[in-house]
Amino acid sequence: MIKLILGLKITIIKLITFDLDDTLWDNGPTIANAEIFTRKWIEKRVGRVEWGNFDDFINLREDLIREDPSIAWDISKLRKEIFKKKINHLVTSSEAEVIANDAFNMFINKRHEVELYDGVANALKSLSMDYSLGVLTNGNADIYRFEIGKYFDFAISSLEAKDSKPNRPHFDKALQKIDGISFAEMLHIGDHQINDIFAANQLGIKTLWFNNKNTKWVQAFEKPEDFSDWKKLPEIIEELYE
């Protein structure tokens, strides 16, 4: 925003970037519903599948990433590979390929059935009038599939960055999207203490921590300003940076 100092206009913040999952919406129920729906859809086509527990899922995920490190940031491809691994002993390899692709399409549609936190849409509308807005996400949600997408100037996923936060490529690419800005003129908002707050902080980017679950701050560096109510966000930013 713009501040008047000795008659001169000084811009403090030009760009605000946002995490998506668990920042704009509660991602846990969304992913759980998408997973349940997709598994039922698959089993109608191949019969009963041994899905295993959460530890099994994580172990399979890690095995697949060891086989192909690039899918660590291509999580859409990773999920397709997980589906294939789970059913390839039940159908032919070509059938597994088709079913996995179709299943992923079902999953990704359900994955976008989110419920925004109260106040998100109005806050983004208000902020977009004064700032450039961007998305920096490790996930595969597409902000432009939502009505609120119209408020954003760009969105960078791990697939585009070819890396994941807390590494810096997301933030470097954000600078390339808006001409003439520096990290010092950015504000990043997210829920994750490492992937969002630490990542931005170490680059000199200003941060706001979304903490709607009253989570304890456990990092070695100073706790940033936080908020839990999206309806208050424009006012908080105005107080801090105008």
Regions found by a protein language model. Give the residues of each.
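N-terminal helical cap/lid subdomain that shapes the substrate entry/recognition surface
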Residues: 9-118
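Asp-based, Mg2+/Mn2+-dependent phosphohydrolase catalytic module
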Residues: 1-16, 28, 94, 121, ...
